[in-house]
Amino acid sequence: MSKTTRKHSDLIYELEDKPPFYQTLMGAVTHLLAIFVPMVTPALIVGGALGLSTEITAYLVSMAMIASGIGTWLQVNRYGPIGSGLLSIQSVNFSFVTVMIALGGAMKKDGIHEELIVSTLLGVSFVGAFLVMGSSFVLPYLKRVITPTVSGVVVLMIGLSLIKVGIIDFGGGFSAMSSGTFGKYEHIGLGLLVLCVIVAFNCSRSPLLRMSGIAIGLMVGYAVALMLGMVDFSALENLPLITVPIPFKYGFSFDFHAFMLAGTIYLLSVLEAVGDITATAMVSHRDIQGPEFQKRLSGGVLADGLVSVIASALGSLPLTTFAQNNGVIQMTGVASRHVGKFIAVILVLLGLFPVVGRFFTTIPSPVMGGAMVIMFSMIAIAGGRIIISHGFDRRETLIVATSLGLGLGVSYDPNVFKVLPAGIYMLVENPICAGGITAIIMNLVLPQSRKRKAAVRDAEAVEVIQLSDKPDVIFTARSAGQPLASKGEGSPEPVPGQAVAPQVERI
């Protein structure tokens, strides 16, 4: 049995405890503050980048909330083999944003109607989610193919690719490009204001203020935009009282080449879920080894896949387990899964009211851009941390250098591989897939040194320990019996060659 170590006292409320109503509600609201902005942002980004109508974008936002509520309910209640039985919160997966934009953008260039674009994107997501469900039964084998180096490269490429989307919104968005107002002083000033507010609150000593920094930054930016007359409320007119979820509202379409592209990201999301569920088990004082833990892992990943099936059918981008909430558990000392039931109900209720989804479409692009630039940059940094966490020898350097070279190269000129067959070109023209596929192939082909093989074997049995009381620097992992090397206070720096568990950080 693995052991966990905490600097502070035990949890106030353990996993199966039932806190009083008020404390349960406050705990739920605290978790919502940590995930709400990242939950609705992907739909807003995809809608803006593809020029989708306000009605469709708002529906995607509403369904994201409803699907997240359903997913959270399944995770915390653990029905048979489905769910982790932990306070695992589901939310929209940022990893799919660039893929959706690339696929939708290509279809838009071909003159395809927006509803058919949406139905294809959701159809691909629907089928791809079954990959996640199947992966829940072969987790040990999958982790040997998609190593920390591979997942780190993919996360790094995701962050770098998304920064372009963020900086476009920072300057006024795609609509400003069309109208010739891109990069105006008020756009840049508003984006910088939001950026500075987020940075300022993330420097706070209060964990709650740090976690709420993005939401506060958006509120300040929205208020200033309102005073400058930059907010258009026309989207809030003549709204129905309730949004009725309609399965496959825009139809069901499927594209095999698009499925191959999205499938790579789905496999990565499996390892994200593994890392997040492991962290949640640790802060909840549950075993992180043994049969019970393996049931939690497979159940959590199975729920991830099932919920993404449901989400895609309803009209939401794919979901995943969020890591931010582990910081909230650590901060509040409340690990009760009954808090998750409140979160689930609140999310579903919010999604049923169309005014909530429509409100987010009124946020000016520069306000969103100011938040997105720093959010996506942090995703890229998280990818770099994942890469170095497993040690960085000559072999890993070659894998990362080659993968980044091809991935970034494709982002600069996607036509470089246009001579390849259409099916292959569809995969490698996307920077994330080009970098990820290169990393997977090189990881399988390049021989490992004896020292590296020993490190990987040691990493099979890891001990996850708490490093800091800061919710934004929560965990690392080490081989059982190996000491951690730290430099002063705060999080220890990874030691080159030190074996650590495959884990994806989510910002």
PLM ranges: what are they?
Residues 2, 9-10, 14-18, 197-200, ...:
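Hydrophobic transmembrane alpha-helices of multi-pass solute/ion transporters
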Residues 6, 39-43, 47, 193-204, ...:
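Juxtamembrane interface elements at the cytosolic ends of transmembrane helices
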Residues 431-507:
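Terminal cytosolic tails of multi-pass membrane transporters
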Residues 22-34, 183-195, 212-213, 228, ...:
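Hydrophobic, membrane-embedded alpha-helices of multi-pass small-molecule transporters
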Residues 59-60, 81-96, 144-152, 209-216, ...:
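Short, non-helical or kinked segments that cap or interrupt transmembrane helices
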Residues 21, 47-66, 70-85, 264-337:
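Membrane-embedded helical hairpins/re-entrant loop segments and their flanking transmembrane helices
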Residues 2-87, 95-107:
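N-terminal signal-anchor module of multipass membrane proteins
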Residues 105-232, 342-456:
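Membrane-embedded alpha-helical modules
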